[in-house]
Amino acid sequence: MKKENGKELIPLKKMTELCNCFNLNMDYVIGIKREHNGNGKHLLDSKEIGSRLRCLRKKYNITQRQLAELLHTSQSTISAYESGKTIILTAFALQIVYKYHVSLDWLCGRTEDMY
């Protein structure tokens, strides 16, 4: 696990397992929502995450390159996330959640509520 600002980041796969085990939502775990009830058990689907990342990018009219610059990564990494070849890193997912005020549960395909 990486440390950022003195806090350990939980890999999304492990966070999903934790949320499934205790019926929590991810937004509660990262501290952006007070409601803690989860919405059932879910597995991470890299293609769904990629689709939602693309949807978010289109909604805010930004290119893969612009998102890559925001996350301090490469355009090819964003492309790999969007195509579902790779699951997005927790640190990148959190940056997106905080910058665009979207739900981590939505980004990870656990709810249809974007906010």
Regions found by a protein language model. Give the residues of each.
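DNA major-groove recognition helix of helix-turn-helix/homeodomain DNA-binding modules
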Residues: K13-Y28, A91-W106
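Short basic helix-loop element that most often maps to the first helix and adjoining turn
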Residues: E17, S51-Q66, L70, Q95
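Conserved hydrophobic/aromatic packing and binding residues within compact polymer-binding modules
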Residues: M1-K3, V29, L53, L67-A68, ...
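A short, Lys/Arg-rich alpha-helix, primarily the initiator
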Residues: H36-K59
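Recognition helix of helix-turn-helix/homeodomain-like DNA-binding domains
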Residues: M1-I10, H72-I88
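Short coil turns linking two alpha-helices in DNA-binding domains
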Residues: P11, N25, T63, S74-T77, ...
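Short amphipathic recognition helices of helix-turn-helix/homeodomain-type DNA-binding modules
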Residues: Y28-N37, W106-Y115
